[in-house]
Amino acid sequence: MAKPNPEELFNLGMLSYDKQDFSKARKYFERACGLNNGGGCGALGDLYDDVEKNLIKATQFYSKACDLKDGRGCGSLGDLYENDQGVEKDLIKAAYFYSKACDLNNGGGCKNLGVLYHNGEGVEKDLIKAAYFYSKACELKESFGCGALGGLYYSGDGVEKNLTKADQYFSKACKLGDQEACEVLKEK
């Protein structure tokens, strides 16, 4: 029988993870990561972040995942820098890793970068850029990005005020599971 390739190892790891067999999942992810599979490295980061609570190791694996062009790994690394977890809080680095994640089509990275631009954290406040990153997040089916973009259209911040577009984005956010957006639609 042929040796499993990195993608197969990652998939086997995910099956084990879903069954809550974290020990077995870690072994598969370690093998996948050792073969330079970004998803395997990112999943190892998740294990150390969420299950084993070792943020130093989580940071190392997210960093390797990001280096291997895994958008989720870049986004998770950005989260650690934004939230002062395992690394010193650094919003400039958070923005950098969210930008990398977004460039790799990670919706969460785009959304988080939009939030940083919206609030002027780690980057200069820029509602036009916030709208751009929320829009990209929404295209990638990130519910918060759709809802936040709807909010910008509703208020006319960073984009021309357009209540029809606001409702369209709130509706998309609601369909993607954003309860706050669903509530906004109910109030109309």
What kind of region is each of these model predictions?
Residues 1-43:
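N-terminal segments that cap or nucleate solenoid repeat domains
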Residues 2, 172-188:
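Terminal, low-structured helical/coil segments at or just beyond the last alpha-helical repeat
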Residues 4-5, 16-17, 34-38, 49-51, ...:
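Short helix-capping/linker turns of helical repeat alpha-solenoids
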Residues 9-18, 43-51, 76-83, 112-119, ...:
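Hydrophobic face of amphipathic alpha-helices that form TPR/SEL1-like repeat modules
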